Structures are given as C-alpha cells and as structure tokens.
C-alpha cells in the first residue's frame, strides 16, 4: 500500500509517510463565518473528506481538525452594518455551514475549534516571537512578524518576494518590510473589537489563529507539528505561507510535513468570490439539486484542477449517479459480500495516485456495466448479488455516494406539495383496486406516468419514483 499526494512545497507527487505509524494528523482551514458557504467552500470540504475517507479505508487512525474563524475584519464589518452582535452572527453561520456540509455527505471533523477559544495560546506564541526579536510592536500597539528574520520565508508558495500582493493585502506605514504581517492588531476604538492581552487591548491577526489551533489540538514533538495541512489554493499565499513562517519561528519546527491545496471553482471563468459578487451559495444550489448529486459533481473533477461550474456537466454527473442507484435498486437489500478484488484494486489504484478521481470513476463505471451484464445472465445468483452489494458499499465508504435507498434517491426533485398529491392518488388507487374498480386504478397509474412518476407495487405497498 502506497499513497501518493501532491505536496505544494516540493511541487510534485510524493509518497505519503506518516509521522507516526498508523496515524494521520490532518488540519484543513475552515470558513470565516460572516456569510453562508459557497461552492468553493463545498469543493474544498469534499476534496479533503475524500482524503480522510481514503486514509481511514487504508487503516489509518485519522485525527482531523477543521477550524472556524470567528473573529475577522469581515465579521466586524457585518456587525457594524447590521447592528447584530458578533457572537450571534458567527453562531448563525457556523450552524448554516454545518447544515450544508451534512447535506453534502461530509463527515464531521473530530474537532471544530473556534479561533476565539485559543487566544491564550496565540499570546504565548506572540510572546515567544517578541522575546526572540522576530516580532516587533509598533508605537500604535500593533505587533508584526519581521519576515527578514526567516530565511525560509517564501519556500511554501514560491512568492516570498511578492511585495505588491502583500502590501495590497495588509499595508501599514509602521511595517519594517511590506511583507511583514500582523500577529496582533491593537484596538482601534468603538468600530473595532478588542480582547485584553499582555500586549494591550486588541485582537489576533488571521494567520496566528490557525497556528495556535494546530498547536493546541494536533501538534506532536519532532521536526513537524502535523502530517498534512490542507485548504484552497487561494490560501497558499499569504495565509499558509505566513502560518508556516510564524510556527517555524516560534517553535523551531515546520508546521506540516505535507501541504495540499485544491483548485478554484469558477463561474464564467472567474474565481468564485464573495467580493466579486459571483458566489453561488451552497444553499442556493441545494434548492435546485440534491446534495448527493452536488457532491458527486464537485468530486468528479480532480481536486487540484479548476472547476468551471456548468449545469450541463452537473446533469451529466446526475445521470452517472443514476446508473449506480439503478444497480442498487436491481440487487435490492440482502447479504453484503466482499467486493470484487479486481474492482477494488482498480478503484484504489486511482485514489492512491493523488486521489485521481477520473481513474477511480472509470473503475466504478466498468463495475456498473459488468454487474448489469452478469445480472442479465444470472439474475438470481445470490453470491453475485452479495458481491455487487459489497462493491456498492465500498463506493459509499470511499466516495461518500450511494448511501440512500433507491426509492428516496429517485424521488428527489419532487416538492413536498407534489409528494402529498402523489401519495393521495396512490391511496385512491389502492382503494379503487380494493373495490375492483380497475379502470380507475389504471387511470391513476397512467395519469402519474404522464407526469413522469412510475409506480412500483410491492408486498409492503406501492412505492413511487420519478421516472
């Protein structure tokens, strides 16, 4: 068993070797909770949910931490504009995010810390950096890290000299170098938020928050704090570069052995961004598409590639997922056997190669085709049915798809009001059959069929699905 992942530092695929045998520590940057989550958040969550599932399937004990940034300029701005307390805003959007992730089939992280819960550790790290002369406090009370003190600055992103980009993000006349970044922001008055600290009233910089939460919940002794740090490629610089820098300077070790980054989601070729006004919120998408279909669509492009949102491609993904559920419906419930060795080998070959989803889904498609052919030849062979159920269970465990009952899957897209009308007609049809009014029963079946609804009579009653 060898898993290869693309390491952003080495800029190539490398063999994953854990810091401790049989264990994986994984940290993924979570959202800044000032608004609902968009498809960019969803894609990142799905990408590293797949990584976690693969590691767990391979027998690793994964300790997965994903944070919430609950203090930030954007949150403060929203509070000032709306008059709503910051705590109420962040609580609402944390709940909203978790609801969205649940509908997308994302496994909950082991720990979901909030930045404000780790202020004491942030202070310790900042104090250490000040004592070492790596950080400095300005007359206004802001504290910056002096990046010239870190010879390795820029190693992660390859953009250590990108002065224009850094100064645009965080400019200040009091910086010694435009690349210096804030560890602590002094309190600026009533339009700001402040916490009492050893350095005066203020609040943490964005980057120090993640370093502190990693130290608190995941860090191990040794050359690296954790195995894998992951997130969107938009975070590579300056956020991840600055995280790596401050941890290296404060602790004397590297933050992560491996860094992984997923590609952007674009709309009409532009990166999805709330600031650009082109965010496609997950909640908006879920009003139109089932969460599992959306998951499968976002999963179907390799995680490092950009994904330009396309309704046509999404519908193609649904048809592909339909095939899986039609096979699941065909074999029905029953004994779950061991999966086909050939199928499992091909599936894992793809996923072990930096989560090559194209190869993995090709293995899935071949399995679906072969399974249907074998069922055509031997429709009642129980051993075959058990193997197919085993194959489907593997897809559920690894890819997070196929967990629904086929009936529920094929009912998606029907509104609650429509469902109620369909159930009423099914009840009326049952009463007509009981009264031997078969003409009326057939009339109801045909009426529903004309609306795209197929009826399935079973020993336990009549079921229905969208045809």
Curated annotation (Swiss-Prot):
SUPFAM superfamilies: Anticodon-binding domain of a subclass of class I aminoacyl-tRNA synthetases, Nucleotidylyl transferase. Its EC number is 6.1.1.16. It is an enzyme of class 6 (ligase). GO terms for cellular component: cytosol. Belongs to the class-I aminoacyl-tRNA synthetase family. Pfam families: CysS_C, tRNA-synt_1e. It catalyses: tRNA(Cys) + L-cysteine + ATP = L-cysteinyl-tRNA(Cys) + AMP + diphosphate. A motif ('KMSKS' region) lies at residues 271-275. It comes from the Bacteria. It is found in: Cytoplasm. This is Cysteine--tRNA ligase. Zn(2+) binds at residues 29, 210, 239, 243. Gene3D superfamilies: Cysteine-tRNA ligase, C-terminal anti-codon recognition domain, HUPs. Monomer. Residues 155-174 are annotated as: Disordered. GO terms for molecular function: ATP binding; cysteine-tRNA ligase activity; zinc ion binding. GO terms for biological process: cysteinyl-tRNA aminoacylation. Residues 158-174 have a biased composition (Basic and acidic residues). Its cofactor is Zn(2+). ATP binds at residue 274. Binds 1 zinc ion per subunit. Keywords: Aminoacyl-tRNA synthetase, ATP-binding, Cytoplasm, Ligase, Metal-binding, Nucleotide-binding, Protein biosynthesis, Zinc. A motif ('HIGH' region) lies at residues 31-41.
């Amino acid at each position: 068993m060898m898993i290869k992942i693309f390491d952003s530092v080495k800029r190539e695929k490398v063999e994953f070797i854990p810091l401790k045998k049989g264990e994986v520590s994984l940290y993924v940057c979570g959202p800044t909770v000032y608004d609902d989550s968009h498809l960019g958040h969803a894609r990142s969550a799905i990408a590293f949910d797949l990584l976690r599932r693969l590691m767990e399937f391979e027998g690793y004990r994964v300790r997965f931490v994903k944070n919430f940034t609950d203090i930030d300029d954007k949150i403060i701005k929203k509070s000032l504009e709306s008059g709503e307390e910051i705590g109420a805003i962040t609580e609402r959007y944390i709940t909203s995010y978790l609801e969205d992730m649940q509908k997308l089939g994302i496994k909950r992280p082991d720990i979901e810390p909030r930045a404000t819960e780790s202020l004491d550790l942030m202070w310790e790290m900042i104090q250490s950096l000040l004592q070492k002369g790596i950080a400095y406090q300005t007359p206004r009370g802001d504290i910056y890290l002096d990046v010239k003190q870190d010879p390795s600055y820029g190693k992660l992103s390859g953009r250590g000299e990108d002065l224009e980009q850094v100064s645009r993000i965080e400019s200040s006349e009091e910086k010694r170098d435009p690349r210096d970044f804030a560890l602590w922001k002094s309190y600026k008055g009533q339009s700001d938020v402040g916490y009492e600290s050893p350095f005066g009233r203020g609040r943490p910089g964005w980057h120090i928050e993640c370093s502190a939460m990693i130290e608190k919940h995941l860090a191990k002794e040794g050359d690296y704090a954790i195995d894998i740090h992951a997130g969107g490629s938009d975070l590579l610089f300056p956020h991840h570069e600055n995280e790596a820098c401050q941890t290296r300077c404060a602790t004397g070790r590297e933050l992560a052995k491996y860094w992984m980054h997923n590609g952007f989601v674009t709309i009409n070729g532009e990166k999805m961004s709330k600031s650009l006004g082109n965010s496609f919120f997950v909640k908006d998408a879920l009003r139109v598409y089932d969460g599992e279909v959306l998951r499968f669509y976002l999963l179907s492009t390799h995680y490092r590639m950009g994904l330009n949102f396309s309704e046509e491609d999404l519908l193609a993904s649904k048809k592909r997922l339909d095939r899986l559920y039609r096979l699941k419906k065909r074999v029905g419930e029953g004994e779950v056997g061991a999966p086909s060795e050939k199928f499992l080998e091909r599936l894992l070959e793809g996923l072990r190669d930096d989560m090559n989803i194209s190869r993995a889904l090709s293995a899935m498609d071949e399995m679906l085709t072969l399974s249907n052919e074998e069922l055509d030849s031997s429709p009642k062979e129980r051993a075959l049915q058990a193997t197919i159920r085993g194959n489907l269970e593997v897809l559920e465990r690894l890819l997070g798809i196929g967990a629904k009952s086929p009936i529920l899957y094929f009912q998606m897209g029907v509104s609650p009001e429509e469902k109620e009308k369909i159930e009423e007609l099914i009840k009326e049809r049952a009463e007509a059959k009981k009264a031997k009014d078969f003409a009326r029963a057939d009339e109801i079946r045909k009426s529903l069929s004309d609306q795209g609804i197929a009826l399935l009579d079973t020993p336990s009653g009549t079921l229905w699905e969208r045809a």
